[in-house]
Swiss-Prot record:
Oligomer and partners: Homooctamer. Dimer of tetramers.
Family: Belongs to the IPP isomerase type 2 family.
Binding site for FMN: A62, M63, T64, S93, N122, K184, T214, G258, G259, A280, G281
UniProt name for this protein: Isopentenyl-diphosphate delta-isomerase
GO cellular component, as recorded: cytoplasm
Main location: cytoplasm
CDD domains documented for this protein: IDI-2_FMN (cd02811)
Catalytic reactions of this protein: isopentenyl diphosphate = dimethylallyl diphosphate
EC number, as in UniProt: 5.3.3.2
Positions of Mg(2+) binding: E153
Molecular functions per Gene Ontology: FMN binding; isopentenyl-diphosphate delta-isomerase activity; magnesium ion binding; NADPH binding; oxidoreductase activity
Function: Involved in the biosynthesis of isoprenoids. Catalyzes the 1,3-allylic rearrangement of the homoallylic substrate isopentenyl (IPP) to its allylic isomer, dimethylallyl diphosphate (DMAPP).
Keywords: Cytoplasm, Flavoprotein, FMN, Isomerase, Isoprene biosynthesis, Magnesium, Metal-binding, NADP
Provenance organism: Bacillus cereus (strain AH187)
């Protein structure tokens, strides 16, 4: 019951706290192309995460589940939207259902709505190999997300305080998983060092989960008597984290998430090196405040606007979008310079 109540609290506070932190994409400028040699009607948006082929570089990221009928209804609606637009979708952490079988329905609903969809199971880094297998089977998942949420746990009144052995547990899951494993942050970004460690144990796909989206430190602080306010602005901005990711030179697929709200955000994230982008809080807010049809319409507009931007840049495919010239400036440039990461190759390609 405590876990289910926490799930509902997360939805309430995520909607009320909003997305107040910057994601850094304002520091990224495309180099205008006066002769793009492109046609809007022939632009294609297919992409891949590792060996998973996706029809769109937009997917619905992990949000909820395990909070009774309310979270079941949210996942049901999100699965409908995913089916309508042929988008991949992740569920929220399934540990609630592994602890309490009665909560499994709030996750299994997605397969009932969209039997042929691409879905990602989701567990925290405390999960065992056996729990990972059960989570994948629960939703007949095409991939498994393992989320890293140290700051959220530290801020959570009842959260974990011991993070030893995480990399070793992830390695065991990767070695034993029958589906691809995606390791993701939850709004605090990832450093190049973290990504190199993950690559060293066989992880091939990473969701950088940058600062700029739902602020889970702020969400958990709303649930505390004594706030740990110093965590509210903690983390690496999304744009910065994508560039840190690409600087590792590992054979990794990258998902950009963390405050992604517009087609321009999507285009910039992909041009920086992401293979795809993920939306969570922005989609949830539209769904809860304006309804499912409004969310369906918003995704239509996102795809149309992305194609407009790709046409302007002369990028006929997502792969070509990953190589258009752009300039990194401002605080993002300063951070990366201090970190020893050269960004000039972006502007000269």
């Amino acid at each position: 019951m405590v876990r289910a109540k926490r799930k509902l609290d997360h939805i309430e506070y995520a909607l009320s706290t909003g997305q107040s932190r910057t994601h850094g994409f304002h520091d990224i400028d495309f180099v205008h192309q006066s002769l793009p040699n492109s046609n809007y009607d022939t632009i294609t948006c297919e992409t891949k995460i590792g060996e998973l082929s996706l029809s769109s570089p937009i997917f619905i990221n992990a949000m909820t589940g395990g909070g009774g009928e309310k979270t079941l209804h949210i996942n049901e609606q999100l699965a409908y939207v995913a089916k309508h637009h042929n988008l991949a979708m992740a569920v929220g952490s399934q540990m609630a259902a592994l602890k309490d079988e009665s909560e499994a329905a709030s996750y299994k609903i997605i397969r009932k709505v969209n039997p042929n969809g691409i879905f990602f199971a989701n567990l925290g880094s405390e999960a065992t190999v056996e729990q990972a297998e059960r989570a994948v089977d629960m939703v007949e998942a095409n991939a498994l997300q393992i989320h890293l949420n140290v700051i959220q746990e530290l801020t959570m009144p009842e959260g974990d305080r011991d993070f030893t052995g995480v990399l070793q547990r992830i390695e065991k899951i990767v070695l034993n998983s029958k589906v691809p494993v995606i390791v993701k942050e939850v709004g605090f970004g990832m450093s190049k060092e973290t990504m190199q460690q993950l690559a060293s144990v066989g992880v091939t796909a990473i969701d950088i989960g940058g600062q700029g989206g739902t602020n889970f430190a702020a969400v958990e602080n709303e649930r505390r008597q004594r706030m740990l306010s110093y965590f509210n602005n903690w983390g690496i901005q999304t744009a910065t984290s994508i560039i840190e990711a690409t600087s590792t030179n590992n054979n990794l697929s990258f998902i950009a998430s963390g405050g992604i709200q517009t087609a321009l955000d999507v285009a910039k994230a992909i041009a920086l090196g992401a293979n795809t982008t993920a939306f969570a809080g922005y989609f949830l807010r539209i769904l809860m405040q304006d309804g499912i049809e409004k969310l369906v319409d918003e995704i239509d507009l996102l795809h149309a606007d992305l194609k407009f931007i790709m046409t302007a840049l002369g990028a006929k495919t997502i792969e070509e979008l990953q190589s258009v010239p752009l300039v990194v400036k401002g605080e993002t440039y300063h951070w990366l310079t201090q970190r020893g990461i050269d960004t000039t190759h972006y502007s000269r390609r």
